[in-house]
Each structure stands twice: as structure tokens, then as C-alpha cells.
UniProtKB/Swiss-Prot annotation:
GO terms, biological process: DNA metabolic process
Protein's recorded name: Oligoribonuclease
Cellular compartments annotated: Cytoplasm
Name of the gene this protein is made from: orn
Entry keyword set: Cytoplasm, Exonuclease, Hydrolase, Nuclease
Alphabetical list of Pfam families matching this protein: RNase_T
Molecular function via GO: 3'-5'-RNA exonuclease activity; nucleic acid binding
Species whose genome carries this gene: Burkholderia pseudomallei (strain K96243)
GO annotations of cellular component type: cytoplasm
């Protein structure tokens, strides 16, 4: 676990019910009933996204038979990133990963308080409910989905929408940091408070 505070000398993250848990998973496909989780990572930030702590980044073992069922996009993407090799070499099961991550999260946020945060996070939540139900119960039932802001910005402020360029690395930890950066981008450029009544620029 690494403190990735943006400012040198910034205080460590204090356990707080307002802290946010950011999560990303890589899967063999899109159907939680037939596909499996192959990587999971978490990052906890404070409520203002100024302080962050990285949690476990885990490749989850799956059989060669399961990996062989992936479509070409998944085989190519996860092959290029090295994830398929990491999955084959891993001895971590879904239950192992869920236990490690729950133990890490409990040190930074009370159970049932943080929404699940990320991009298109409902998809991760579907897989977690299917394959890691005990970890899914750690989260509040709400989601904080950066994709909501993305879709609104795309329709209401297309110039701002085009200003954030994703790296599309498709590894769990990199995708989390990109989601946090994307939310900061929308906060600074899209979520602009209106001036109080009667106040002019």
C-alpha cells in the first residue's frame, strides 16, 4: 500500500465515514453469470480527493479453460498488459482477494458507509455480488459513478467532455487513478457553483 498524496508532507489518510472507496476490476467478459474476475484493485481517498492510499492490487487465478473462453478483445488487451500471465501465475482465489481487500478497507472507512466509486461501477458491482458477495456487502448501496458526469458533460458541455483524454490502459489500478483524475477534471470545469443571487462577476 502506498500513500500517493499529491502534496509532500500532507497528512496520512484518517479513517472516516466520508472517505471514498474507489474500485476497478478486470473480467474475462461482460456476463457475471458466465465470466470471471481476473484482477481487482482499490484506492481509498478522502472526501475531497486530496489524499489517497492504494490498497491491494491482485491478479486472481482462473483456469486455462476459463481464459480460453475470452473473446479476441479481452485476449489481446489482457495479453498485451501482461495480466493473463499474472492470472496464470497467481494462487489468489476470489475469496482470498475479497478477504484481503475487506481487511484493508476496514482500516480506512467503516463498513456500509462508502459508496462504490469508479467508472461504469455498476458492472463491477454486478460481478462482485456474484463472485465476492461478502465484499460487496462492505459498501453502501449507493454508487458514485463518474460515468454519470461523463454522459451529462457529453450532452451539455461537449467541448469540456472532449478535454479529458483517457489512456485506456485496462489495468485495474491505472483505471482507478484515471477515474479519480476524471472526477477532479469535471469538478473543476463542469461542476461550477452558480454565483449567489445578486452577485455579478
Amino acid at each position: 500500500m502506498t500513500d500517493i498524496s499529491a502534496v509532500a508532507g500532507q497528512p496520512a489518510l484518517v479513517r472516516n465515514e466520508l472517505n471514498l472507496v474507489w474500485l476497478d476490476m478486470e473480467m474475462t467478459g461482460l456476463d457475471p453469470d458466465t465470466d470471471r474476475i481476473i484482477e481487482i484493485a482499490v484506492v481509498v481517498t478522502n472526501s475531497t480527493l486530496d489524499i489517497a492510499v492504494e490498497g491491494p492490487v491482485l491478479a486472481i487465478h482462473q483456469s486455462d479453460e476459463t481464459l480460453a473462453k475470452m473473446d479476441d478483445w479481452n485476449k489481446n488487451t489482457h495479453g498485451r498488459s501482461g495480466l493473463i500471465d499474472r492470472v496464470r501465475a497467481s494462487s489468489v482465489t476470489e475469496a482470498d482477494a475479497a478477504a484481503q481487500i475487506a481487511a484493508f478497507l476496514a482500516r480506512h472507512v467503516p463498513p456500509g458507509k462508502s459508496p462504490m466509486c469508479g467508472n461504469s461501477i455498476c458492472q463491477d458491482r454486478r460481478f462482485m455480488a456474484r463472485w465476492m458477495p461478502e465484499l460487496e456487502r462492505f459498501f453502501h448501496y449507493r454508487n458514485l459513478d463518474v460515468s454519470t458526469l461523463k454522459e451529462l458533460c457529453r450532452r451539455w458541455q461537449p467541448a469540456i467532455y472532449k478535454g479529458f483524454q483517457k489512456r485506456a490502459m485496462h489495468t485495474a489500478l491505472a483505471d482507478i487513478h484515471e477515474s479519480i483524475d476524471e472526477l477532479k477534471y469535471y469538478r473543476e470545469r463542469f461542476l461550477i457553483p452558480a454565483a449567489p443571487a445578486g452577485e455579478t462577476a
